[in-house]
Regions:
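Active-site-adjacent structural elements in enzyme catalytic cores
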Residues: 1-203
Length: 203
């Protein structure tokens, strides 16, 4: 199902349908401030396992990331000291993934890795969905094969053509970007940029 959403003034019924799908353990594809991504309710372990199978990743070996509406409940999902919190507050919402040690509320599948990526994208659509869901969304970028056209991860109609069988809902938010988020590792206290992407860190 392809649903067109905008930065504001969306149909409440469309938003409610998306939230319902997530609460039932479904998978959605959605725009962010970087690239289109695929995700699910982060606290539904079976849905998380479904995403891992789709991406062909082992959660014991790969970092998993979640989208939060804001930083107000961040301590439930990750361990964050004062300096790291201030750094995140200066840079979020924005095109960053902050790697932190996992908190107590995340499913066991996260705790096997002991680290979790935290995103608060500068994109109204996915943040509004997060707010209505009242829970984080597991997030990972759409896969692109080596010889495949970039349009298959940027153009909603082509995304639907390729991934429609995997996702319960695809959100059409217009043409997506191609640059990933900047990854900042904060697990050792001192912030370290491990991948420079779209975001430029204000320290």
């Amino acid at each position: 199902m392809l649903i067109k959403l905008y930065e504001k003034n969306n149909n409440p019924k469309d938003l409610a349908r998306i939230v319902e799908v997530l609460e039932e353990g479904g998978i959605i594809i959605y725009p962010t401030d970087t690239m289109y991504a695929i995700g699910c309710h982060a606290l539904k372990e079976r849905a998380v396992e479904r995403i891992c199978r789709f991406k062909g990743i082992d959660p014991r070996k790969h970092n998993l990331s979640i989208i939060c509406y804001d930083l107000s409940n961040i301590s439930e999902y990750a361990k964050v000291d004062n300096n790291t919190f201030k750094l995140m507050k200066r840079n979020l919402p924005g095109a960053f993934t902050f790697i932190l040690n996992t908190g107590s509320r995340l499913p066991k599948i996260f705790k096997n890795r002991k680290e979790v990526g935290i995103r608060v994208p500068d994109h109204a659509v996915i943040r509004e969905i997060c707010q209505l869901l009242d829970a984080p969304i597991l997030t990972t970028t759409l896969p692109l094969e080596e010889r495949e056209d970039i349009e298959y991860i940027t153009t909603p109609e082509l995304i639907a053509e390729k991934f429609g069988g995997e996702a319960d809902i695809i959100i059409d938010g217009g043409i997506g970007g191609t640059e990933p988020s900047t990854v900042v590792n904060c697990t050792e206290g001192e912030a370290e940029i491990v991948r420079q992407g779209k975001g430029w860190l204000e320290e």
